[in-house]
């Protein structure tokens, strides 16, 4: 009898602890710092994905066999692939939702809130974050329907990544869409990276300019990697 009561108490205690933990997390998210933390964490996840995705894309320069083997190996472990996709989807949704809420809070707080002497002059990237976000989201949907599912790709062949990429980027309009979209991603990313550092406390008059430069260089090197693929196909370097 005593053992049953003890087990029940422990189970009840665990439930109470879980509920309390969820409540603390919810209250933390309600704060501006909490929303910025979510933006930073999800942004880091998405940034990591972009690095991995670019590394995969650049294998097109290694030839048909290497690129297609990469695609086959990527799809060989379905649970891992779908797990990564779910994490990415949740990260995108949380990132977008937190950014919308922060933008709303910022608008409500004007002209008092965020009006700091050192931050009056904002960059073009920071001013267009809320505009570039929806455009990038629309491009991601197009990209998934184009080169992931093949719905918008008339010559799509499953797991033939090399042929799919070359056939797609041989069309100038498709290449232009991708290049313009990646330029927007670069603009979004250059501001997002240094904002991530700022959100976790790396804000100092001495180091902030250096972090901004690092963020810009890193973002544009990454985007140059993505853009190099359609440019190479259009130039006939990859065929």
List each model region and its residues.
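Membrane-embedded alpha-helical bundles that constitute the cytochrome b-like, heme-associated redox core
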Residues: 2-239
């Amino acid at each position: 009898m005593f053992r049953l009561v003890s087990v029940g108490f422990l189970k009840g205690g665990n439930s109470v602890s879980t509920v309390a933990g969820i409540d603390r997390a919810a209250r933390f998210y309600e704060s501006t710092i909490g929303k910025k933390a979510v933006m930073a964490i999800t942004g880091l996840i998405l940034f990591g994905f972009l690095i991995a995705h670019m590394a995969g894309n650049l294998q097109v320069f290694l030839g048909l066999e290497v690129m297609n083997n990469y695609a086959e190996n990527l799809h060989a472990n379905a649970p891992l692939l779908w797990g990564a996709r779910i994490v990415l989807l949740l990260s995108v949704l949380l990132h977008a939702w937190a950014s919308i809420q922060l933008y709303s809070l910022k608008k409500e707080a004007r002209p008092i809130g965020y009006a700091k002497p050192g931050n009056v002059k904002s960059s073009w990237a920071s001013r267009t974050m809320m505009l570039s976000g929806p455009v990038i989201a629309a491009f991601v949907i197009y990209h998934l329907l184009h080169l992931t599912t093949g719905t918008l790709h008339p010559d799509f062949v499953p797991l033939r990544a090399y042929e799919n990429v070359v056939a797609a980027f041989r069309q100038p309009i498709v290449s232009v869409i991708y290049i313009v979209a990646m330029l927007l991603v670069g603009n979004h990313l250059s501001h997002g990276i240094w904002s991530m550092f700022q959100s976790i406390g790396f804000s100092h008059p001495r180091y902030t300019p250096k972090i901004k430069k690092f963020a810009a260089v890193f973002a544009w090197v990454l985007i140059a990697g993505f853009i190099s693929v359609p440019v190479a196909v259009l130039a006939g370097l990859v065929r």
